[in-house]
């Protein structure tokens, strides 16, 4: 668990459109890395390349290297499904299977892998729900539909589903954007706990959230409309928010643009 990610000279294209240019960065194990920047700067595009989710879009391609420890996830013969198992994703809006029970939501990935042993499934459901700080709230209604939970509970259910398959990395695409402040606090507390076991990358538009939950922060920006997004700088979150190297970073953090 908790592997390192390294990007070297990564360029991302959709057909002939150059979406992101020349990204090189290291994402350390058992830490939280935040991607920040204005809309359209490429931060979510980069996030999705980390587990090849962008490939669902026709014409998408990546140049450069993305290494999970020492394994290039884009090397010939690498199965994208295996990549997504090792590098899980939590999306912007909670997306549990609404008619499926809470228990079956959590173990859906294991069942897709062919696991049928009831004890293994039940034990995994409990451990994953505990890991997502949801067990005490749902342990007496595991057979009720996941769609009946509150928004914040649904997002934690999605996190439980992601960790049930024992990934090395968790990607989170604005996981609190549709949640109320109390639910957001619960997710942020959970992120701080999960980083003890997982490598976490989070995209957020909330500067305060990035400052609260992350160990390092990467700032992305656009040179101009129609130009590719670029990584401006990456450093410890303390440095990015107190003394960044680039004026563009300071301007964005201070709210002068974006």
Curated annotation (Swiss-Prot):
Q: Which purpose does this protein serve, as stated in its record?
A: Part of the ABC transporter complex PstSACB involved in phosphate import. Responsible for energy coupling to the transport system.
Q: Which organism is it from?
A: Mycobacterium tuberculosis (strain ATCC 25618 / H37Rv)
**Name of the encoding gene:** pstB1
PANTHER family (alphabetical): ABC TRANSPORTER I FAMILY MEMBER 17
**The protein's name:** Phosphate import ATP-binding protein PstB 1
The answer to whether keyword Cytoplasm applies is: no
Which transformation does this protein catalyse, written as a reaction? Answer: phosphate(out) + ATP + H2O = ADP + 2 phosphate(in) + H(+)
Q: Which residues form a coiled coil?
A: none
- List the Gene3D superfamilies: P-loop containing nucleotide triphosphate hydrolases (3.40.50.300)
Instruction: List the PROSITE patterns.
Output: ABC_TRANSPORTER_1, ABC_TRANSPORTER_2, PSTB
Chief location bin: membrane
């Amino acid at each position: 668990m908790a592997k390192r990610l390294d990007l070297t000279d990564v360029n991302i294209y959709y057909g002939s459109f150059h979406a992101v240019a020349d990204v090189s960065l290291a994402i350390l194990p058992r830490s939280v890395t935040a991607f920040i920047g204005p809309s359209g700067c490429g931060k979510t595009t980069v996030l999705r390349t980390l587990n090849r989710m962008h490939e669902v879009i026709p014409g998408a391609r990546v140049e450069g290297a993305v290494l999970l420890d020492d394994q290039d996830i884009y090397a010939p013969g690498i199965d994208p499904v295996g990549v997504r198992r090792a590098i899980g994703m939590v999306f912007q809006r909670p997306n549990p299977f609404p008619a499926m029970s809470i228990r079956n939501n959590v173990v859906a990935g294991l069942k897709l892998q062919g696991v049928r042993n009831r004890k293994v499934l039940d034990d995994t459901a409990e451990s994953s729900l505990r890991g997502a700080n949801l067990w005490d709230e749902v342990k007496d209604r595991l057979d009720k539909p996941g769609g009946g939970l509150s928004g914040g509970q649904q997002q934690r259910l999605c996190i439980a589903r992601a960790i049930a398959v024992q990934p090395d990395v968790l990607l989170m695409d604005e996981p609190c954007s549709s949640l109320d402040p109390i639910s957001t606090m619960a997710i942020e507390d959970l992120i701080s706990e999960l980083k003890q076991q997982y490598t976490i990358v989070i995209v957020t538009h909330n500067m305060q959230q990035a400052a609260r939950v992350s160990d390092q922060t990467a700032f992305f920006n656009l040179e101009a409309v129609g130009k590719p997004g670029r990584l401006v700088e990456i450093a410890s979150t303390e440095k990015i928010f107190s003394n960044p190297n680039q004026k563009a970073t300071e301007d964005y953090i201070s709210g002068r643009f974006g």
